[in-house]
Amino acid sequence: MHHHLNTLYQGQSLSRESTRDAFGQVVRGEVDPIVLASLLTALKIKGETPEEIAGAAEALLAEARDFPRPDYEFCDIVGTGGDGLNTINVSTTSALVAAACGLKVAKHGNRSVSSKSGSSDLLDKMGIKLDMSPAQARHCLDKLGICFLFAPQYHAGVRHAMPVRQALKTRTLFNVLGPLINPARPTYQLMGVYAPELVRPIAETLLALGLKTGMVVHGAGLDEIAIHGPTQVAQIRDGEIREFMITPADFGLETYPVSAIQGGEPEENRAITAAILAGQGTPAHNAAIAANVAPLLLMAGKAADLKSAAAEVLAVLASGKAAELAARLATLSHQEA
């Protein structure tokens, strides 16, 4: 480890292999907390490279609990959190809606980072079991087209870094790792990041990790596609990254103020999500979900463009199909596979 630290102290970047080695030691609990604090701080001050982020992600995936990966195509929709704007749970709600649209979704999530309730806080409130075994989760994915993978169930080693992360009280490499370490390893992915300068590096990281199709987005201050302004996109397709901007108009949607998708406490967010899933969401809530599910339909080849994809999502929302799916998931999640 000290060899890796000396490289960083000289202002140089670590290779992917070196970072993989360093973070392998971290998640195995072999690194003294003071040394770990130095590692995270040195990386942060230098600025983490895509190779370093990929190496750390590979280390965590290598130590993760196995998930029985299916041979069909499936996706994840996830944000880093940490945008500080406390909006409704767009990615969690979108995951349920995407499944209601016929996609297969294995969503990786954790307790809250940015909103008052993260994906796990919301699922808990909806009666969906968080600590499903990998076999149970796979059963839900096969039968219903959706499962939720609760990060601590798969990445137990990350607990070794928790005291240091809490003591540092600043963002570190761990803040961007969560969305990159889905143990199911989805075939395509929509990932939101909390800062515009992360869009390109995280897309490069996903490409380095072998993702074939995906989008990394930052929406005017949010770690998701915005309905209140433009969204910066880095699209991964056929081994290449293309960068562009999209606006609500590209989806055929109105523009709304960000206050229209303000979130609340876990119970309030559960009520908001329940209303959206049942076809009783506000126009702004529905638009936020449509904008974030539409790219997944496009990536899956189930829509020709963003406008027709968003229209399909709005139709599924109006049908209340997603509420039915959430209720079935709550029941199935408590049954043995």
From Swiss-Prot:
Ligand binding (Mg(2+) 1): 91, 224
Record-listed anthranilate 1 binding positions: 79, 110
Binding locations of 5-phospho-alpha-D-ribose 1-diphosphate: 79, 82-83, 87, 89-92, 107-115, 119
Keyword Transferase carried by entry: yes
Keywords in alphabetical order: Amino-acid biosynthesis, Aromatic amino acid biosynthesis, Glycosyltransferase, Magnesium, Metal-binding, Transferase, Tryptophan biosynthesis
Cofactor: Mg(2+)
EC numbers for this chain: 2.4.2.18
GO biological process: L-tryptophan biosynthetic process
Pathway connected to this protein: Amino-acid biosynthesis; L-tryptophan biosynthesis; L-tryptophan from chorismate: step 2/5
Disulfide partners: none
Reaction equations catalysed: N-(5-phospho-beta-D-ribosyl)anthranilate + diphosphate = 5-phospho-alpha-D-ribose 1-diphosphate + anthranilate
Enzyme class name: transferase
Cofactor note: Binds 2 magnesium ions per monomer.
GO cellular component: cytosol
Entry-linked Pfam families: Glycos_trans_3N, Glycos_transf_3
GO molecular function, one term: anthranilate phosphoribosyltransferase activity
Residues that coordinate or bind anthranilate 2: 165
Annotated binding of Mg(2+) 2, by residue: 223-224
Function: Catalyzes the transfer of the phosphoribosyl group of 5-phosphorylribose-1-pyrophosphate (PRPP) to anthranilate to yield N-(5'-phosphoribosyl)-anthranilate (PRA).
Record note on quaternary structure: Homodimer.
Protein family: Belongs to the anthranilate phosphoribosyltransferase family.
Protein name as catalogued: Anthranilate phosphoribosyltransferase
Gene: trpD
